[in-house]
A protein has these predicted regions:
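Glycosyltransferase catalytic domains, chiefly GT-A lineage
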Residues: 1-268
Length: 268
C-alpha cells in the first residue's frame, strides 16, 4: 500500500519548533502543508514565553516547558543561546509525538514552503525506513561564488535538518536517545569543537544507525546554498520545477528570508 494514494494506515504528524515571534512564518509553512496533507496532524512546539494558542484551530500548540522538567529547561535557558536552545529540544519533540501513538513524524523548519506531496519521502517511510534526511548539496558549491560553500558544510553538517522524517522504529528510538543525550550540553555552534547545534551530530547517522535513507534529490530542500546548480522555472499555477516541467519541486527552504515592513527581503 502506498501513502501517495491517501490510503493511510499509519498515524502521522508534521511539526515545527518556533518562538512566538516566529510563529507567523510557521503558520505560512503549515498552510502549504495543509494544502497537500489535509489528513495529517500539525504541531507547533513553542519555545519561551508568548501565547500562540489561537494561531490556528488546525494546529496543535505544545509549549516546550510542558514536556521538559523544570530543572532541565532552566539549565538550558541559562546555558544556551536562543538558536542553540530551540534546536536542543528536537529529539524530545519526536519522542513526545511517538509516545502519543504517532507512527511517523516529519520536522520542517518554519521557513520551508511545500509545493506538492513529498511522494518520495512517503514511499521511503512506508517501505520501513527508520528515517529520511536530505544533504545540503548534491554537487560542489564554490565558495568564491556563493557565501556558503563546501567548507561551510564541513563545519555545519552534511545534512540540512530543516527537514527530518522519522518512523517510530526501535532503531529510531535508539537514535533519538543518543541524540537527546548529546544535545543536553553539546548543542552549541562552535567550529573549534567541531559542533554546529543539533545538525552536525547527524553526520554520524549513516554509520551509527541502520535504516536511515539519504534522499539525494534536487527537488527537496532547494535553498540559497545549492540553487546555483539548477534552472528553476514556474507554471501559471505557482508551482516550481527544476529544468523542465517533469521535475516538480517538493519544497523550497527560504533560509535567510526576513520580513521588512510589507515585503520580504533575502538576507545572506
Amino acid at each position: 500500500m502506498s501513502l501517495v494514494n491517501n490510503e493511510f494506515s499509519k498515524k502521522q504528524a508534521i511539526f515545527t519548533v518556533s518562538d512566538a515571534n516566529y510563529a507567523v512564518m510557521a503558520l505560512t509553512m503549515f498552510d502549504s502543508v495543509s494544502e497537500h496533507y489535509p489528513e495529517i496532524d500539525l504541531f507547533l512546539f513553542v519555545v519561551g514565553k508568548g501565547n500562540v494558542d489561537k494561531i490556528d484551530n488546525n494546529i496543535n500548540v505544545i509549549y516546550i516547558h510542558d514536556i521538559l522538567d523544570d530543572i532541565d529547561l532552566s539549565q538550558r535557558i541559562s546555558y544556551y543561546l536562543q538558536v542553540e536552545l530551540a534546536t536542543s529540544f528536537r529529539p524530545q519533540c519526536f519522542e513526545h509525538l511517538f509516545s502519543h501513538n504517532y507512527d511517523s513524524a516529519i520536522y520542517l523548519d518554519p521557513d520551508l514552503y511545500i509545493f506538492r506531496r513529498m511522494t518520495e519521502v512517503d514511499e521511503l517511510l512506508e517501505d520501513g525506513a527508520s528515517g529520511v534526511v536530505t544533504p545540503h548539496a548534491l554537487k560542489t558549491v564554490r565558495s568564491n561564488v556563493a557565501v556558503i560553500g563546501d567548507e561551510t558544510f564541513l563545519k555545519c553538517g552534511i545534512f540540512n535538518l530543516g527537514f527530518l522524517a522519522l518512523n517510530c522504529t526501535s532503531e529510531t528510538l535508539r537514535m533519538l536517545s543518543w541524540w537527546k543525550d548529546k544535545l543536553k550540553w553539546q548543542c552549541v555552534a562552535d567550529s573549534r569543537l567541531g559542533l554546529f547545534v543539533d545538525q552536525k551530530w547527524l553526520d554520524l547517522l549513516p554509520t551509527y544507525f541502520d535504516g536511515f535513507e539519504i534522499l539525494k534529490s534536487p527537488l527537496y530542500n532547494l535553498a540559497p546554498w545549492n540553487s546555483e546548480h539548477y534552472s528553476v522555472i514556474s507554471d501559471l499555477h505557482g508551482k516550481f520545477y527544476i529544468d523542465n516541467f517533469d521535475n516538480p519541486i517538493a519544497f523550497i527552504h527560504f533560509s535567510g528570508v526576513r520580513r521588512a515592513s510589507n515585503h520580504f527581503s533575502f538576507l545572506k
